[in-house]
């Protein structure tokens, strides 16, 4: 098994990333790369899937896959249960890192920064366009808590369906969005012989500085 893992590799030869291709600020490049991923990546890859890393109050890291649900000039938005493990971690230490990986394009984007809650109005607006099952699930699931078995979860959902049988569910107070306000964004383009292209943007005094990093 160890040798098999050691032999697993691929060479990246699809494209390069030069300073001439990169704008002065990172959002334009992210929009371009994300649009390329939407057009190019095929299921089961989801272009808006990302790894979100957080740190708990003891300094221990945690990561999981989430879906990006908003992007504007302020930052990158995702939604979750505020009482979940990640919600508690962000309450204790409001900083996070995101990583997008688009294997067909041989590209990766790393984003780091401070995290803030979005407004209740923004959370409600997104909540209302979710499928009904997802809206009910936000009420039914005590996310990250220990439950007895799958049947308990089904019972919680059934009770929630009965509760809202005559009305549409409102957005729960314990559920909503976070926005990561980027302070660093790195664009990685795979290249041959592991000599990858890495362009890094750092926010300093409200201005973005671009630099090339060694692979």
From Swiss-Prot:
- Give the GO biological process terms: pyridoxine biosynthetic process
InterPro entries linked to this entry: Pyridox_Oxase, Pyridox_Oxase_CS, Pyridox_Oxase_N, Pyridoxamine_oxidase_dimer_C, Split_barrel_FMN-bd
Signal peptide (UniProt feature, chain positions):
none
Q: In which pathway does it act?
A: Cofactor metabolism; pyridoxal 5'-phosphate salvage; pyridoxal 5'-phosphate from pyridoxamine 5'-phosphate: step 1/1; Cofactor metabolism; pyridoxal 5'-phosphate salvage; pyridoxal 5'-phosphate from pyridoxine 5'-phosphate: step 1/1
Q: Give the record's keywords alphabetically.
A: Flavoprotein, FMN, Oxidoreductase, Pyridoxine biosynthesis
The record's EC number reads 1.4.3.5
What does this protein need as cofactor?
A: FMN
Q: At which positions is substrate bound?
A: 9-12, 69, 126, 130, 134, 194-196
Q: Which PROSITE patterns match?
A: PYRIDOX_OXIDASE (PS01064)
Name the Gene3D superfamilies for this protein.
Answer: Electron Transport, Fmn-binding Protein, Chain A (2.30.110.10)
List the molecular function annotations (GO) for this entry. FMN binding; pyridoxamine phosphate oxidase activity
The top EC class, named as a word, is oxidoreductase
Q: Which reaction does it catalyse?
A: pyridoxamine 5'-phosphate + O2 + H2O = pyridoxal 5'-phosphate + H2O2 + NH4(+); pyridoxine 5'-phosphate + O2 = pyridoxal 5'-phosphate + H2O2
Determine the domain of life of the protein's source: Bacteria
Pfam families referenced in this protein's UniProt entry, alphabetically: PNP_phzG_C (PF10590), PNPOx_N (PF01243)
Q: Which residues bind FMN?
A: 64-69, 79-80, 86, 108, 143-144, 188, 198
Free-text comment on the cofactor: Binds 1 FMN per subunit.
Give the matching NCBIfam families: pdxH, PRK05679.1
Question: Family assignment?
Answer: Belongs to the pyridoxamine 5'-phosphate oxidase family.
Subunit structure, as described in the record: Homodimer.
* Functional description taken from the UniProt entry: Catalyzes the oxidation of either pyridoxine 5'-phosphate (PNP) or pyridoxamine 5'-phosphate (PMP) into pyridoxal 5'-phosphate (PLP).
The name of this protein is Pyridoxine/pyridoxamine 5'-phosphate oxidase
């Amino acid at each position: 098994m160890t040798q098999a893992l050691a032999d697993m590799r691929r060479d990246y030869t699809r494209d390069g990333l030069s300073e001439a291709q990169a704008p002065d600020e990172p959002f334009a490049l992210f929009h371009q790369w994300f649009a390329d991923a939407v057009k190019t990546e095929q299921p089961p890859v989801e272009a808006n899937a990302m790894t979100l890393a957080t740190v708990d109050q003891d300094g221990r890291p945690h990561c999981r896959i989430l879906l990006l649900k908003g992007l504007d000039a302020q930052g990158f938005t995702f939604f979750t249960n505020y009482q979940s493990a990640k919600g508690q971690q962000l309450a204790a230490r409001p900083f996070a890192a995101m990583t997008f990986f688009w294997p067909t394009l041989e590209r990766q984007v790393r984003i780091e920064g401070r995290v803030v809650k979005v407004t209740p109005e923004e959370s409600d607006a997104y909540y209302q366009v979710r499928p009904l099952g997802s809206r009910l699930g936000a009420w039914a699931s005590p996310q990250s808590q220990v439950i007895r078995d799958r049947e308990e979860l089904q019972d919680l959902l059934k009770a929630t369906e009965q509760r809202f049988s005559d009305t549409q569910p409102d957005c729960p107070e314990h559920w909503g969005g976070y926005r990561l306000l980027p302070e660093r964004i790195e664009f990685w383009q795979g290249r041959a012989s592991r000599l990858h292209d890495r362009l890094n943007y750092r926010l300093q005094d409200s201005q973005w500085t671009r630099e090339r990093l060694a692979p």
